[in-house]
């Protein structure tokens, strides 16, 4: 099997082949010179400096001015470079010839037959031939293998492995399930209060904490950059501190795995450390039968803020489902099933979320079934949200203090550390600070004071019971489609979105009192989440609004909706969550809120007037945008291209804007002159003697040498000089 050597990114295209060095049949080593290429570039040079430049000028400079000093001139210079072989092997054929122009990257230069493609490399050595392999020796981009940073495979091998995996899964009638850990299937905290309550039978939370597991890990020390003695030797590091983690498994997890495991091959993907992930895996999968070693952690992910299925399945994600409590870290990919976050240790949050983008507090913190809770519980919920906010403020304050120290160390360090970026150090500081703040502030103990002898921790979550049904339905849909004859191959990246979109189809939402003020609602998680299920959300009520979502029926928007359009359903947020977990639009009646005092007739009239003005403004704006789009899409070549060859150099009027007509007119004229210069060059090339005519195997260049725009007569002189230089170069 032959390997194509292609023109790489980063060369100063277009380039011209000047010489082919090895002949067909020659054996190439990695790094051997394949060919010589040349390219041209423009330089601006003052001709009165008298300096002796060793570089070859293709043409002489311009004429001197009246005062004896020549103005700066543009000169075309030629440069020659070598192109080296990235691979080892026998040269089978050349796909370019001397004189050919290569216009862009990724054009085939030649083909070789390699003794080994080095498809699998471990620790820098090929597992097939034993040779040391550089990154350039891969056929394509080297891909990291999950769980082992030393193992890499080529794109060719990844495709082969992907096909084999698909065949294996289909033979077993399985799909792939990627599982997040924190707040998806478990909740973890480091508050020492948990251990105290767990060991106190008289504590009201004792029974709820019976099945809480615990483990300990060494805290990762974030040492100062200058942590060394005066003689340059490292200081003795401080003693390692142990941190106790307390883990609550989401209710129904055992039944969930029993239902899902026969249908899915499961993988763990977490933004926690590998040590943490392995400990959690021991708790949720003590025998290792469910996940095995299929664990991807922050240590192997390559990103501190995002997750990507390409890390696990680089060539094909058509059989993959993801479950995670965060949609933003996945960029809301089509494979994602977002779950309601599991919040057992109230007020603690996700201890590993410091490595992820910050989330705004709001509706998602409420969770489900909040309408069934007592007034006292509602007050507690408010306290929980306030407590989380205060904890985050303390974390931010501590991180800021540490960052100032870090910035000072970076500023005074002669050489910054190469092993870690500032971003990585900052994230570690945030993580360390979050653990320390939770341990010292004991948020659970503070919240328990509100309830006295009543239990704070309630274990009534039922998310996984609904989720197992959803996953079973997706599995059935996939294999039903696969069994149909003459149908396109099923793809979960299409199946999952199509099932979701039916839930809130033709629903138009307005949220009241649930999204923090000043937030762009289109960037809010709940708005993005519901949009993946087919809903459209707007900040204000209009003629299309079908649902107003609020906890409080006395808000202005709720009162307005009641008066403006009685058909608008005013519902509690629990209705949204019930639809999301069931993947179907449930009846609104049990969640409908009663509005006792709608707005007055006068207020309604004022609103309708403002709404009418808003509608007129939107229509006017859309009309203007439509007109601009129509102008931009004018087909300038509908009547032919003869107008491009106008020898009188007439200016082309600008149709896009009347306000800046003069400026745009000048710019257009300059661009036309540049294009004409390039067209003349091509015309000269086309009429050149047959013996020296260029044969271009790759795409023709659309860009000539870059010319900086001058002013007035200087610009015309420069254009004339450039044309003379190009003609002299071609004559040579």
UniProtKB/Swiss-Prot annotation:
One cellular component term (GO) for this entry is:
nucleus
Question: Span of the secretion signal?
Answer: none
Name the enzyme's class.
Answer: hydrolase
**Phosphoserine modification, residue list:** 701, 718, 720
Keywords, alphabetical? Hydrolase, Isopeptide bond, Nucleus, Phosphoprotein, Protein phosphatase, Ubl conjugation
Question: Which InterPro entries does the record associate with it?
Answer: BRCT_dom (IPR001357), BRCT_dom_sf (IPR036420), Fcp1 (IPR039189), FCP1_dom (IPR004274), FCP1_euk (IPR011947), HAD-like_sf (IPR036412), HAD_sf (IPR023214)
Localization terms from the record: Nucleus
Which residues lie in Basic and acidic residues bias regions? 677-712
MF terms from GO for this chain are:
protein serine/threonine phosphatase activity; RNA polymerase II CTD heptapeptide repeat phosphatase activity
EC number(s) given by UniProt: 3.1.3.16
Q: Which residues form the FCP1 homology domain?
A: 170-363
Residue ranges, annotated region (Disordered): 50-73, 642-732
Q: Which GO terms describe its biological process?
A: regulation of transcription by RNA polymerase II
| PROSITE patterns recorded | BRCT, FCP1
Q: Which reaction does it catalyse?
A: O-phospho-L-seryl-[protein] + H2O = L-seryl-[protein] + phosphate; O-phospho-L-threonyl-[protein] + H2O = L-threonyl-[protein] + phosphate
Q: Where is the composition biased (Acidic residues)?
A: 646-674, 713-732
Record's Pfam families? BRCT, NIF
Q: Which PANTHER family match?
A: RNA POLYMERASE II CTD PHOSPHATASE, RNA POLYMERASE II SUBUNIT A C-TERMINAL DOMAIN PHOSPHATASE
Q: What else is known?
A: Present with 6550 molecules/cell in log phase SD medium.
- Name of the featured protein: RNA polymerase II subunit A C-terminal domain phosphatase
Q: Which gene encodes it?
A: FCP1
């Amino acid at each position: 099997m032959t390997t194509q050597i292609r023109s790489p990114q980063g060369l100063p295209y277009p380039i011209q082949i000047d010489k082919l060095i090895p002949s067909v049949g020659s054996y190439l080593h990695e790094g051997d010179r394949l060919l010589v290429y040349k390219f041209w570039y423009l330089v601006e040079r003052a001709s009165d400096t008298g300096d002796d430049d060793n570089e070859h000028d293709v043409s002489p400079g311009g004429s001197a001015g009246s005062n004896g000093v020549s103005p700066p001139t543009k000169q075309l210079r030629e440069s020659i470079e070598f192109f080296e072989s990235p691979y080892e092997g026998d040269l089978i054929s050349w796909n370019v010839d001397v004189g050919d122009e290569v216009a862009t990257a990724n054009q085939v230069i030649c083909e070789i037959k390699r003794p080994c493609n080095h498809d699998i490399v471990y620790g820098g050595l090929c597992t097939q031939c034993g040779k040391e392999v550089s990154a350039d020796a891969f056929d394509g981009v080297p891909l990291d293998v999950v769980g082992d940073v030393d193992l890499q495979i080529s794109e060719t091998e990844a495709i082969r492995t992907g096909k084999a995996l698909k065949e294996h899964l289909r033979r077993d009638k399985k799909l792939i399930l990627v599982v997040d850990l924190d707040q998806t299937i478990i909740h973890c905290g480091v508050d020492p209060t948990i251990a105290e309550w767990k060991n106190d039978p008289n504590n009201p939370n004792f029974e709820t904490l019976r099945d809480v597991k615990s483990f300990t890990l060494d805290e990762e020390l974030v040492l100062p950059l200058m942590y060394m003695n005066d003689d340059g030797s490292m200081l003795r590091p401080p003693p390692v501190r142990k941190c106790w983690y307390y883990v609550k498994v989401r209710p129904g997890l055992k039944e969930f795995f029993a239902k899902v495991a026969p249908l899915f091959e499961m993988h763990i993907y977490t933004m926690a450390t590998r040590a943490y992930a392995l400990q959690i895996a021991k708790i949720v999968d003590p025998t290792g039968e469910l996940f095995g070693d299929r664990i991807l952690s922050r240590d192997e992910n390559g990103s501190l803020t995002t997750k990507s299925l390409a890390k696990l399945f680089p060539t094909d994600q058509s059989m993959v489902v993801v479950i995670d409590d965060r949609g933003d870290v996945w960029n809301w990919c089509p494979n994602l099933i977002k779950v309601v976050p599991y919040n057992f240790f109230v007020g603690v949050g996700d201890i590993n979320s410091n490595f992820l983008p910050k989330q705004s507090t709001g509706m998602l913190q409420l969770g489900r079934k909040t309408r069934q809770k007592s007034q006292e519980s509602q007050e507690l919920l408010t306290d929980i949200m306030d407590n989380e906010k205060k904890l985050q403020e303390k974390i931010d304050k501590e991180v800021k203090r540490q960052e100032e120290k870090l910035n000072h160390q970076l500023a005074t360090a002669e050489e910054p550390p190469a092993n870690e970026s500032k971003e990585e150090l900052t994230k570690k500081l945030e993580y360390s600070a979050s653990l320390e703040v939770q341990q010292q502030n004991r948020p659970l103990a503070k919240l328990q004071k509100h309830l006295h002898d009543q239990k704070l921790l309630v274990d009534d979550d039922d998310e996984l019971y609904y989720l197992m049904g959803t996953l079973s339905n997706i599995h059935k849909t996939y294999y039903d489609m696969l069994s149909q004859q003459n149908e396109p191959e099923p793809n979960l990246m299409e199946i999952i979105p199509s099932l979701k979109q039916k839930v809130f189809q033709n629903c138009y939402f307005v949220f009241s009192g649930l999204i923090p003020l000043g937030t762009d609602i289109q960037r809010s998680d709940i708005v993005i989440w519901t949009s993946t299920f087919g809903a459209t959300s707007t900040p204000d009520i209009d003629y299309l609004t079908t649902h107003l979502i609020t906890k409080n029926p006395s808000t202005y928007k709720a009162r307005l909706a009641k008066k403006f359009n009685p058909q608008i359903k005013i519902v509690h947020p629990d209705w949204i969550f019930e639809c999301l977990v069931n993947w179907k639009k449930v009846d609104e009646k049990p969640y409908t809120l009663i509005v006792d005092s709608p707005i007055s007739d006068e207020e309604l009239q004022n609103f309708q007037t403002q709404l009418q003005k808003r509608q007129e403004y939107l229509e006017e704006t859309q009309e203007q945008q439509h007109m601009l789009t129509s102008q931009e899409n004018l087909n300038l070549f509908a009547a032919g291209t003869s107008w491009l060859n106008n020898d009188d150099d007439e200016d082309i009027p600008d149709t896009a804007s009347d306000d800046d007509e003069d400026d745009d007119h000048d710019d257009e004229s300059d661009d036309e002159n540049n294009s004409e210069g390039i067209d003349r060059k091509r015309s000269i090339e086309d009429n050149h003697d047959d013996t020296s005519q260029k044969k271009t195997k790759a795409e023709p260049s659309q860009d000539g040498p870059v010319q900086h725009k001058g002013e007035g007569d200087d610009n015309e002189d420069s254009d004339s000089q450039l044309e003379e230089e190009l003609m002299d170069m071609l004559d040579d």
